[in-house]
């Protein structure tokens, strides 16, 4: 069996560790000899900004933005016509599949004209006679 060519996750993990380790070496340092020689005025940018104004809590009722679901999400279906063929078991389409349904066979000869009745033509009863 041929071995599949799949991407090695160990290679991905090693590459990720090396990339992160290289990125840690290139951390931005402010201009100067070391990081500890920052002036006291550098922090004033953040301390002089005023805090955001406090808002009063919203206690009123919120409007409902969801549309209500229609309880009738299905339409009634038309009754189906099952065509019954000779020597074939009749299995209704909407049977309970958990119940062991025993299919039964329709008789040969009485199949067609009893379930699909036709009009019998009477001789001499044409509408063209006068």
Curated annotation (Swiss-Prot):
Keyword Signal: yes or no? Answer: yes
Checking InterPro entries in the record gives: ODAPH
Tell me the Gene Ontology biological-process terms attached to this UniProt entry: positive regulation of biomineral tissue development; positive regulation of enamel mineralization
**Name listed for the protein in its UniProt record:** Odontogenesis associated phosphoprotein
Taxonomic lineage of the native organism: Eukaryota, Metazoa, Chordata, Craniata, Vertebrata
Protein keywords = Amelogenesis imperfecta, Secreted, Signal
* Primary role: May promote nucleation of hydroxyapatite.
Q: Where in the cell is it found?
A: Secreted
Q: Where is the signal peptide?
A: 1-23
Asked if Cell cycle is a keyword of the record, the answer is: no
What organism does this protein naturally occur in? Answer: Homo sapiens
Q: Name one matching Pfam family.
A: ODAPH
GO cellular component labels:
extracellular region
- Clinical note on disease: Amelogenesis imperfecta, hypomaturation type, 2A4: A defect of enamel formation. The disorder involves both primary and secondary dentitions. The teeth have a shiny agar jelly appearance and the enamel is softer than normal. Brown pigment is present in middle layers of enamel.
Q: What is its main location?
A: secreted
Tissue expression, as annotated, is: Highly expressed in placenta.
């Amino acid at each position: 069996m041929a071995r599949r060519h799949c991407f090695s996750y160990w290679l991905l993990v090693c590459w990720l560790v090396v990339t992160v380790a290289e990125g840690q070496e290139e951390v931005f340092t402010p201009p100067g000899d070391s990081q500890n020689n920052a002036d006291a005025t550098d922090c004033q940018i953040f301390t002089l900004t005023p805090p955001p104004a406090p808002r009063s809590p919203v206690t009123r009722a919120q409007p409902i933005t969801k549309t209500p679901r229609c309880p009738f999400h299905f339409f009634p279906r038309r009754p189906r016509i099952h065509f019954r063929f000779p020597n074939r078991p009749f299995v209704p389409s909407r049977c309970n599949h958990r119940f062991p349904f025993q299919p039964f066979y329709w008789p040969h000869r009485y199949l067609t004209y009893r379930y699909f009745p036709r009009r019998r033509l009477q001789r001499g009863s044409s509408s063209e006679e006068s």
